């Protein structure tokens, strides 16, 4: 049975990780590539479909163009986190509103994450976005 101190630490870790994912969504919505890259470990990766972006240079390539157009607006929910010392895994659902070639889109999927505590702060070691659907808003998802 975990001690009260261990239980409090687990709750604090989970809260910090939830805040990490919230900061990620805010930075995406604001097109803030510097903040997004800072949320990852130096050897961090982001995977979506068949594309993978690795390391700080790869992440900057991924996020660098967000401010050029209308940045996506991600919303996350149902966040489940398992903490194991200085690493953790998590999964959260995501709904994203975005514009592609001048047309509004709705995207749904989930993030499968691995987190690492680095210099006393939780960061993404990896984010893998799995898409359920990505369709023009005018068509709906069903």
Region spans (language model):
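C-terminal-biased regions
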Residues: 2-3, 97, 125, 131
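Extended, polar beta-sheet/loop recognition surfaces of beta-rich domains
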Residues: 140-142
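Short, cysteine-centered beta-strand-loop-beta hairpins and adjacent loop/turn segments enriched
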Residues: 97-104, 134
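Alpha-helical elements of Rossmann-like donor-binding domains used by nucleotide-donor carbohydrate transfer enzymes
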Residues: 23, 58-61, 110
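Short, surface-exposed coil-to-beta transition loops
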Residues: 74-76, 106-111
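A solvent-exposed, acidic/Ser-Thr-rich amphipathic alpha-helical stretch
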Residues: 33-96
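Short, low-complexity N-terminal intrinsically disordered segments enriched in polar/charged residues
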Residues: 1-30, 34, 38-39
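Short beta-strand edge/turn micro-motifs at domain boundaries
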Residues: 89, 108-138
């Amino acid at each position: 049975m975990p001690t009260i101190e261990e239980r409090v630490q687990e709750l604090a870790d989970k809260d910090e990780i939830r805040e990490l994912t919230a900061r990620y969504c805010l930075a995406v919505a604001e097109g803030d590539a510097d903040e997004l890259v800072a949320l990852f470990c130096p050897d961090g990766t982001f995977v979506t479909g068949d594309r993978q972006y690795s390391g700080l240079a790869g992440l900057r390539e991924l996020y660098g163009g967000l401010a050029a157009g209308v940045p996506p607006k991600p919303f996350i929910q149902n966040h489940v986190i398992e903490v194991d010392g200085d690493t953790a895994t998590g999964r959260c659902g995501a709904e994203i509103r975005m514009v592609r070639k001048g047309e509004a889109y709705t995207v749904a999927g989930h993030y499968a994450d691995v987190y690492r505590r680095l210099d006393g702060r939780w960061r993404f070691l990896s984010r893998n976005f799995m898409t359920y659907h990505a369709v023009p808003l005018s068509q709906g998802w069903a």
